[in-house]
């Protein structure tokens, strides 16, 4: 039996009822990690308001949902472990081991293997979320952060900030098969849904590299220019690509913008003004809205994906870092 389920009372199923956007879309929750407050903010999608603030471990950063959306995994970076929160009761029900200073992670499509980037020991820790067992630690570059998994589950990509590389890891052999050099301080990696490309953001380099999964070579490099904004403020971090593979959204950090990129031409179509130091991004299930965590203005921006407009700002805790949508 899953070790997490042992700690849950039987019959604790969703009891909030079903609410709708207009005539179709089902209501959901948005989870935000607040790095300075040591909390998770829970936002209701109907009201766009915070309905719960949950105290968690020290310096929560990366967050990700379990495959069934029942649990939220939280990188408690200064506690050197991963916490598990029940998304219905909002209680921390378990902790999982990691290395020192876990920052980001990715869950394998099997829903069992969690790959954790530990910034302080240059390792990726692989944990079985059902047993809490460390399966292996994989040496990577210096200051690992970004994590992505191919749709077929065969490859993990880790980015190392100081080594300036994307490391391709075979999930069967658990060995690095390829190292791809990118620009300075790669912070995030995102596979496209067809598994053909990986988008890697380089914060200090100011670029996003598009890497072919087949050749393991950079095939395009995207740069940014916002009138009136200093080039050194254009610091790409979070990246999300739509399921139809037509559009990419890129958080530009202290530029306070999200770049909208045509994935066919690799040209920037638009810059959307959001909160201060925009960091991570998350779509809702239907990709109607994109949520951005804005670390310095302490809020979340809501972007209408079809209209490419910012429609709402939601105040959360101090230094919001990660965002995930149930």
Describe these PLM feature segments.
Residues 2-12:
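Bacterial N-terminal signal peptides that target proteins for export
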Residues 15-18, 23-326:
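Predominantly soluble domains enriched in secretory-pathway, periplasmic, or organellar proteins
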